[in-house]
Amino acid sequence: MKINFTKMEGIGNDYVYIDATKNDIRLSPEQIQKLSDRNFGIGGDGVIFIRNSNSGEFQMDMYNSDGSSSEMCGNGVRCVGKFVYDHGLTKNQKPTIETGKGVLTLDLKTGTNGKVEMVTVDMGEPILKPSLVPIVWKGDEPVINQVIEVQGKQYHFTAVSMGNPHCVIYVDDADDFPVREIGPIIENHPFFPRRVNVEFVSIKGKDHLYQRTWERGTGETLACGTGACAVTVASILNGKTGRSVRIDLRGGTLHIEWQENGSVFMTGPAKEVFSGEVEI
């Protein structure tokens, strides 16, 4: 079977995008792993199908590079917005996208060539109730600045869900931190029944943070949009920043704002890398 695809990236968080609005394309976990393979496939952090939706204009159906399904990807949903607009699936510059977190509204900003360059996403309200993050914890109070022990060392973390679970940890120097050693241990920690994405964060200045992310089912990625939203929420809850934050990641920069009304807004670029046809 031959499939048309488009490779896209949002500050280095790259996925293989497949338009399934006309044909109901479904792939097995093994096929998704094959497409995501950076040596023997197209290469990416996973595969995202763009489908028709009964609750929004389109649905984002997302899978990690290991073939497991995922609820949400902030960088991914920005690229979905660019895809549906640039490829003529909609003329609406404020399309609604159904995700595992619910229906999100995007605000598309086009450049001089008429193509989408920047996207702002209303990511909705963060989820802090432990049972909904989810995290195995006593009580219903948000898990803020609590202790997790890894390899005999204690780390303070805050648990936030942006439709997918995040564990935010502050370190002195995230760039020098052993993310690939500690990340997978926390990802699979008994605290987190559905595993967890882990953010390692250092403070660069006033309302300016640096983030590295270990994504569940994928490993370290150059960027994580929902992670940046979770980091912003955690930073405000811990009194480290104001409500509008610049977050630098290895792939680029995102601007996140947690508004007083509860919604988190994420702004960042979306780019198309190349497109083609693949035998699967």
From Swiss-Prot:
The keyword Acyltransferase does not apply. Pfam families: DAP_epimerase. This is Diaminopimelate epimerase. Catalyzes the stereoinversion of LL-2,6-diaminopimelate (L,L-DAP) to meso-diaminopimelate (meso-DAP), a precursor of L-lysine and an essential component of the bacterial peptidoglycan. GO terms for biological process: lysine biosynthetic process via diaminopimelate. One of its GO terms (molecular function) is diaminopimelate epimerase activity. Pathway: Amino-acid biosynthesis; L-lysine biosynthesis via DAP pathway; DL-2,6-diaminopimelate from LL-2,6-diaminopimelate: step 1/1. Belongs to the diaminopimelate epimerase family. InterPro entries: DAP_epimerase_AS, DAP_epimerase_DapF. GO terms for cellular component: cytosol. The active site is at C73, C224. It is found in: Cytoplasm. Its EC number is 5.1.1.7. The gene is dapF. The record marks H166, E215 as: Could be important to modulate the pK values of the two catalytic cysteine residues. Transmembrane segments: none annotated. Substrate binds at N13, N64, G74, N75, N164, N197, E215, R216, G225, T226. Keywords: Amino-acid biosynthesis, Cytoplasm, Isomerase, Lysine biosynthesis. The keyword Methyltransferase does not apply. It catalyses: (2S,6S)-2,6-diaminopimelate = meso-2,6-diaminopimelate. Its main location: cytoplasm.
